[in-house]
Structures are given as structure tokens and as C-alpha cells.
Amino acid sequence: MFSAQNKIKKDKNAEPTECEEQVAQALFDLENTNQELKSELKDLYINQAVHMDISGNRKAVVIYVPFRLRKAFRKIHPRLVRELEKKFSGKDVIFVTTRRIMRPPKKGAAVQRPRNRTLTSVHEAMLEDVAFPAEIVGKRTRYRLDGSKIMKVFLDAKEKNNTEYKLETMVGVYRKLTGKDVVFEYPVEA
């Protein structure tokens, strides 16, 4: 019979953690109780889920989804996030696609590394995942006098209602995932 275990598939058949079991159970419950999400959630599963404590009293649940299922998750993203945030009260839910970074090839090696497996490409894609459903309309990198750098990311103002309440969480999650400082803003319309 179907169960919440079918909603999580980890690498090398590793045992799911307590957090991952909670998320899988929530997805399974949504599939069984929510009629509008039932057909879309039927074939979807997750790879990993992590609870993160962000600065202050904010908490987030970061859910990793397989690259193949990225489009399907994005199609139902706003509704799914709304339902999951109800279940995990007080926690922001962020979906991130599972991606791998390959190390640069050794000198003299004949192998080519695909562009989408480079560190830069994976971090940029993670930034898009964290900011979703808002679209990134611009980026500026600011170098400070002490040598540190901070990236300003401008989000599309159309999705302001869906994303504004969790900007602080998005900054904290991106910093924990990549180690880079980022600031999310909405461009000022003149």
C-alpha cells in the first residue's frame, strides 16, 4: 500500500531523518486530503529535507527535490508552499533543486566539465530556486573596502505579495547553503 515512505527517495537507500519523515508525511496527507493537489502530487517525491534556524526567531524547512521533477514542483509551488506552511506553523518552506558540483578537471586531463556542474552555475541556480516564485530581474555585486563582497538581487515586484514576508528567511537559507552574502530587494519604480 502507498505510504509516506514513497514520498522520499534518498541516495544509496539511506534512512530518512525525522525531519524528512515529517515532510514526506505532510506531502502524503496533502495528496490524500487536498483534491486540487492530488493529481499533481501523485508522482512527486523529495530527496532531502532540512530544518534551518535563521537569524532571530525565524525557522525554515528547506526541501530538496530531484532535478527531473523541478518543473512539476514549480507548477504547483505557490499552493504547495501555502499548504505546507500551514502544516509547519511558523516555519517558511523553501524548495531547492538537488544539484551536484564537480571539481575542476586536473591539468592535462581530457575530460570536460559541463557548465551546469560548476560551482558558479549551481550557486546561481540555487539563488533562483530560493527566490522562486519571484523572478530575478537584476543583480549587482558590491565590493566593500575590507575586501568582502555582497550581492544585491532585485526581484520582480509582481510577486511581492508572495515573497516579501520571507525575504529574511531567503537571505539566511542562501547564506547557509552557499556561504555567500546576499540582499534581496525590489527595484524602485520611478
From Swiss-Prot:
Q: Does the keyword Coiled coil apply?
A: yes
| The UniProt record lists the keyword Transcription regulation | no
Entry-linked Pfam families: Ribosomal_S7e
Print the keywords alphabetically.
Acetylation, Coiled coil, Ribonucleoprotein, Ribosomal protein
GO CC annotation, single: cytosolic small ribosomal subunit
Q: Which domain of life is it from?
A: Eukaryota
Record GO terms (molecular function): mRNA binding; structural constituent of ribosome
Q: Which GO terms describe its biological process?
A: translation
Residue runs in coiled coils: 17-50
Residues with the modification N-acetylmethionine, per the entry, are M1
The record's listing under InterPro entries reads: Ribosomal_eS7, Ribosomal_eS7_CS
Can you list the disulfide-bonded cysteine pairs?
none
- Family assignment? Belongs to the eukaryotic ribosomal protein eS7 family.
Give the protein name, as stated in the record: Small ribosomal subunit protein eS7x
